[in-house]
Amino acid sequence: MKLVNIWLLLLVVLLCGKKHLGDRLEKKSFEKAPCPGCSHLTLKVEFSSTVVEYEYIVAFNGYFTAKARNSFISSALKSSEVDNWRIIPRNNPSSDYPSDFEVIQIKEKQKAGLLTLEDHPNIKRVTPQRKVFRSLKYAESDPTVPCNETRWSQKWQSSRPLRRASLSLGSGFWHATGRHSSRRLLRAIPRQVAQTLQADVLWQMGYTGANVRVAVFDTGLSEKHPHFKNVKERTNWTNERTLDDGLGHGTFVAGVIASMRECQGFAPDAELHIFRVFTNNQVSYTSWFLDAFNYAILKKIDVLNLSIGGPDFMDHPFVDKVWELTANNVIMVSAIGNDGPLYGTLNNPADQMDVIGVGGIDFEDNIARFSSRGMTTWELPGGYGRMKPDIVTYGAGVRGSGVKGGCRALSGTSVASPVVAGAVTLLVSTVQKRELVNPASMKQALIASARRLPGVNMFEQGHGKLDLLRAYQILNSYKPQASLSPSYIDLTECPYMWPYCSQPIYYGGMPTVVNVTILNGMGVTGRIVDKPDWQPYLPQNGDNIEVAFSYSSVLWPWSGYLAISISVTKKAASWEGIAQGHVMITVASPAETESKNGAEQTSTVKLPIKVKIIPTPPRSKRVLWDQYHNLRYPPGYFPRDNLRMKNDPLDWNGDHIHTNFRDMYQHLRSMGYFVEVLGAPFTCFDASQYGTLLMVDSEEEYFPEEIAKLRRDVDNGLSLVIFSDWYNTSVMRKVKFYDENTRQWWMPDTGGANIPALNELLSVWNMGFSDGLYEGEFTLANHDMYYASGCSIAKFPEDGVVITQTFKDQGLEVLKQETAVVENVPILGLYQIPAEGGGRIVLYGDSNCLDDSHRQKDCFWLLDALLQYTSYGVTPPSLSHSGNRQRPPSGAGSVTPERMEGNHLHRYSKVLEAHLGDPKPRPLPACPRLSWAKPQPLNETAPSNLWKHQKLLSIDLDKVVLPNFRSNRPQVRPLSPGESGAWDIPGGIMPGRYNQEVGQTIPVFAFLGAMVVLAFFVVQINKAKSRPKRRKPRVKRPQLMQQVHPPKTPSV
């Protein structure tokens, strides 16, 4: 039995440790070595950004020598009579080359010198210099959690970054992303992410990233790190005199891309160019990045990894330089952000069309909870966001190089980004015609070959999971052409096409806008020939829809946009069914060589469209969301709605029904309401079509014409529901930012909502909000509620219904750190317009219960009740009979807030003129008018399946076979005694398998199967040996008694 126990013990060890077969321990002591599959450290990223006082970046229209730049600035400032200025020296590797910017210091308050600079013909723009702070803090996680348990039990919060920061989260493998522990299919997790994605197949073919220049913009790299053999150059762009990595993040990123041993990278033979752009104190400046980007262009970098990001897509010098980089054929790969699962949290530059934006998944192919979601918010309020991320790949528990050697595991999209950057570097080395590789063609190959993940929408996964081998197949058959992202529009396909598939279209509704990205692999510049053509399929009722187009006049760099507005024709107002058609566009680019005498390359692309049409819903079921009056960072400082959330100082998610109000939108749809978005002033919608106008967290001002029209609309039956937020000038001054280093104040431009503007809108009905600031938990109609930094109602009509509660005075707490309880705070008001056919108005002082950003307890039930009231005039019994109902406040003892003096809202407002003094409205803009495309009907049947892998040049991926491995396969040797890590391979080529899952899993199970069979036979042998022996029967001699008394026999 001892032998049996030994075999069973071996079997258990093999079953529990099969994941680590072939791995070598990085530590010699079992007691000190943690489980290789998980770590007990979590990396928390905290960051901020401030404007450096008196320092400005002067951008020029071209590249000039230092002498010429100095001359331009001097001549411009001479006429302004500004004497106290100087050019700040920049001592870095690009100082000896011409540059397109300069950093100057001007100590003046009137900004006359800045205006004079901008008037100079050679100066393009003058913007403030920004100082960036990042803090990477390691925190102990719960060591009692088993290695194979999910780590999603912790609460993830949006970091709401002010700046570009490293996008790594922590260490440890997350093998499953379910929130609850449950029975699930387990499989062997490969050792290395490069082998998981089958990079070893390309290694065996002889491709290892050789002759490809890859840049890593991060925290540096040690000179003699054992994992790297081809570090071509290390440059320092900071004010510290070191090139080494004191934090480890840059080393990890470089290791994922090009490590040659232990935690193997994708391209071990690539030429590494290390750009140290962060100090050991985790500080950086915009100008450091600009200089480093210029140097990367000079060095003809092929691939650039940027595992940093921030929400400021209006940081013009940075964004412009990224465009210039990609225009110079640099393939930029960037992390999409770690602010998931909240929508509308994409980081720049990953959200740019010319950049490959990467999201994260775990090793079970689930979207990582931390990975930021789309849509882009550049286009709001008038348009609709683009599809991002582009692709997703492994970003949870990925192993990479440690700062002094060995391996560590980290999680975050800054981990997923170098995975794609390494894969791209490897792919570039496989292409024979290197001139065909550019930022567009590489992105086309990646998204066309990506594997779609089931049950995940387009704003979470982009085009799907990175597939390295399929991308290799496409690139090696590629011919320059244009393509689209997404490659089709199917408003009936759920969940992938969410939110488009969540609501059918109908006559009279706001047009549905789909923002498509055009990728132009033919050249850095291009154009759309003539206009796009709309061709409806008559057998599929395509003539029941009409489309309008808006598109880039010039496709640069490598990309552009095509916005398609889809609406229903009047003849289909009562029709229900599916309508289909397609759009044809032709893209032209200049010829590749001058020998073609100015001839253009052209590429024609088809965009299928499929929509579901229903009869126009009744007015009572139609809700109009006011997007036009919602503002968000960037560019202004619009503070958070919940002042308790100190780690998220800005309101930057767009305040859209498909971003941070997504859950509210989903709830309204489940209740049968149809929600449309208004991206124009109130003068641009037909109020007779809608039952309720929903205004939530509004920060914008109002045109006088809007106020007058809204009054008429409410008198004629339109209802109004307003969810407000705090506005207190004393608190606004208190929450301003102060930087001890730069002595710079950053003042809020408004409160959580623009209460002074709302009060002007409501004054005609004798309503208004106060400047009170309240917080607390309460119960309303048997529902637990939380009031998070809300305001109160200052005045309300006497014949209205008002609900009050008892709260803490949060304003007093913020200002004086004192606690006080206030009773009978009016928070909810309901009012019926007395005129016949008039609408209804509802006021509520807090929007956090609808906002996904920091919602603690939702109030969707309350929204349902309020919409029942506004749509049908029935006061909910739970509110009309509430014990908290009080007499409406007359406004005599309440204070309504005034606009804060010195605010800069006019700089970012669509309503106010930019001038000193009292705010003055701009002229009312014209309402957008769409030009519907002339249809070119087709009397043919539409394709049945719109989703097909985007076939570039009719490449059939299912029929393409990988080439045979090259004969010069690498020779591997075992590790020498004392050497840590994996195999050491001459030439940097790493052994692998054709199919990672088959190659790794089959030998393991075969070995385990053999062990089971062997154990079975051992058990049987031991049983046979231990069984008591059976005695042989002996022939007994007859006894005397038997002879005397014979045995009885049956009688017949």
Swiss-Prot record:
PANTHER family in alphabetical order: MEMBRANE-BOUND TRANSCRIPTION FACTOR SITE-1 PROTEASE, PEPTIDASE S8
Pfam families: MBTP1_N (PF23001), MBTPS1_3rd (PF23094), MBTPS1_4th (PF23090), Peptidase_S8 (PF00082)
TM annotation in the entry: 999-1021
Gene designation per UniProt: MBTPS1
Catalytic activity: Processes precursors containing basic and hydrophobic/aliphatic residues at P4 and P2, respectively, with a relatively relaxed acceptance of amino acids at P1 and P3
Cofactor(s) the record lists: Ca(2+)
Tissue expression notes: Widely expressed.
GO BP terms in the entry: ATF6-mediated unfolded protein response; cholesterol metabolic process; endoplasmic reticulum unfolded protein response; lysosome organization; membrane protein intracellular domain proteolysis; mitotic G2 DNA damage checkpoint signaling; protein import into nucleus; protein maturation
UniProt KW Secreted keyword: no
Keywords noted in UniProt: Autocatalytic cleavage, Calcium, Cholesterol metabolism, Disease variant, Dwarfism, Endoplasmic reticulum, Glycoprotein, Golgi apparatus, Hydrolase, Lipid metabolism, Membrane, Phosphoprotein, Protease, Serine protease, Signal, Steroid metabolism, Sterol metabolism, Transmembrane, Transmembrane helix, Zymogen
Name of the protein this chain belongs to: Membrane-bound transcription factor site-1 protease
UniProt signal peptide: 1-17
Domain Peptidase S8, first and last residues per copy: 190-472
Site label Cleavage, positions: L186, R187
